[in-house]
């Protein structure tokens, strides 16, 4: 099964997450199929904290990829920012 989830990066105490499409059997920070965006929970006011390629997200969902609950929350947050 293919899932859309967060992959952690950044330094200790300074998390940074990539939103990736990956096989469910692969570990969290392992190999992925495609990078769809990023989430920076420690972003300052003048920095971009969240970016998601909506067209690619729609494509992967149309071919059966499942989103993690956290990614679903971030997608709703991004939609609210766009409006």
UniProtKB/Swiss-Prot annotation:
Record keywords, A-Z: Ribonucleoprotein, Ribosomal protein
GO biological process annotation, one example: translation
Annotated Pfam families: Ribosomal_S16
Cleavable signal peptide: none
Highest taxon above the source species: Bacteria
InterPro entries with a match to the protein in the record: Ribosomal_bS16, Ribosomal_bS16_CS, Ribosomal_bS16_dom_sf
A GO CC annotation given for this chain: cytoplasm
MF (Gene Ontology): structural constituent of ribosome
Family: Belongs to the bacterial ribosomal protein bS16 family.
Protein name according to UniProt: Small ribosomal subunit protein bS16
Organism: Verminephrobacter eiseniae (strain EF01-2)
